[in-house]
């Protein structure tokens, strides 16, 4: 005759499993801050890769260098009331694009890089509302909207990449050798990463989650090497 579990034994097992799950479950909770940092670092590296395989040099165009590939942080209001596409000025997002028009801004969905993980999407979460056609809206990538997707409330830029006025964002451009530049260049090779006293320094990007935890991303001058450090656990 086979022995069977009693009802009491089954209840005890269920209780033990429940207690174990209560301790284990938090370890599997989503870490928005680290996910955002990993994604940003990967896309900065991807921008550098695009710049190195897409040399923009053109002897017939004196402003050829303005077309280089750009990684751009911004929190400027798009004035387009679309769910998840920056409905207010405290909505951080970023774009990866080649400034083909030389306007210093992303003006067309076709200028944005294709998402290497999903070719139907572009590496932008929104830009000038006048350019957001129905086709463009389908290609927007909400994972690049850091506030909406990852609950990132603020981003600070220090050392080699001081933000523009009002801290509305920065631009990191890469040349054909993968070297990073800060902002909108006036010459082909200039505007290195330098701090307030003119010393060459890494670009330091600090993300702050809505719960107050922070994570820092560094982009090194000359090499463009990207590292993540000092990520708080929560």
List where the protein language model places each region:
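Exposed loop/turn and edge beta-strand positions of beta-sandwich/beta-sheet ligand-binding modules
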Residues: 10, 65-67, 168
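Membrane-proximal N-terminal amphipathic helix
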Residues: 32-65
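Terminal alpha-helical segments
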Residues: 34, 56, 92-99, 213-215
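Intrinsically disordered, low-complexity regions enriched in Pro/Ser/Thr/Gly and acidic residues
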Residues: 97-221, 227-229, 233-234
